[in-house]
Amino acid sequence: MAVKWTGGHSSSILCLNANKDGLVASGGEGGDLVAWGEDGTPLGHMQLEGADDVTSVLFSASCPTKLYASHGETISVLDVRSLKGSLDHFHVNEEEINCLSLNETESLLASADDSGAIKILDLEKKKVTRSLKRHSNICSSVAFRPQRPQSLVSCGLDMQVMLWSLQKARPVWITNLQEDETEETEGPQTPGRLLNPALAHSVSVASCGNIFSCGAEDGKVRIFRVMGVKCERELGFKGHTLGVSQVCFLPESSLLLTGGNDGRIRLWDVSGKMEKLQKSPARHIHRKKAKRAACPTQGGNSRAPGAEDEGHAKILPKLDIEHGEKVNWLLSTKIKGNKSILVADQTSCVSVYPLNEL
């Protein structure tokens, strides 16, 4: 059962983040921003100027009281100890920002917006040093790669996933999830079965910096490995019966949290499955065969947690939570020293699930 944190918001919570001291920030509709203590007590509240939805919140790792929040086309810099006004603000995006990401050295802040652009803000110079424009639709998610402060991945509603190098200011690798999907689903289709387009909603990079995941509207979770300036898809499986709204690697781990519009939260160990595929001499043959395979057996049964991967083997979640609400944001952090999953959804509560057994 989840512990519910209440009393902070009056409408849907859209985003979450936590600092290393256990302080949690949540952003909601109408400009609402709340800071929470580890016991779930609201410590501070403010309404950001303009009353635009707060779409992303991000703590500084080097200065744990500093918080970046995106609302509308603006990024505000706040001190969570005193939520009375912003320390600084930047208006660098032309349309609503969807996601923020800091690089590991905290010299650069990326902001992805509805125009498909990603603005790279130099925090020392306080100016945009790069404007990355390649997505042809909303850029929904962006993430700097750990250990590689000049490299990032992004995804968007144009169904594209991109790897960027800031030295080049252009993507060094692009894949279209829908083309990928078309190849896989060649052959007989179930009559009357509609496939959701692979609109990409969320990306997350593992701590190693070389493995990243993407969640999409078709219910699939895809795992990629960066190989120099190219990426290879390592794994793809049907993780949810509706769109995957959130993917989130646990810190220093290959365990992946996913949340979906089906109201479920699942935890997957993707490393073991990738190792098996890599060791298999028939790996590429399996992939070709999988392209002719019918869709995973999970179908419309949300209680069948197994999902087929490209090699026809099933990948089973280590944890399967029937949360019951569409997931807006997922976060793995320590609360009072215990590993926990924090969930933002369509309600005004933050839900906290324990991860102690893992």
Curated annotation (Swiss-Prot):
InterPro entries per record: WD40/YVTN_repeat-like_dom_sf, WD40_repeat_CS, WD40_repeat_dom_sf, WD40_rpt, WDR53
Key words, A-Z: Repeat, WD repeat
Presence of the UniProt keyword Protein transport in the record: no
Pfam families: WD40
Top-level taxon of origin: Eukaryota
Region (Disordered): 288-309
Ranges for the WD repeats: 8-47, 92-131, 134-174, 195-234, 239-278
UniProt-listed PANTHER family: WD REPEAT-CONTAINING PROTEIN 53 (PTHR44666:SF1)
Stated family: Belongs to the WD repeat WDR53 family.
Protein name per the record: WD repeat-containing protein 53
Organism: Mus musculus (Mouse)
Gene that produces this protein: Wdr53
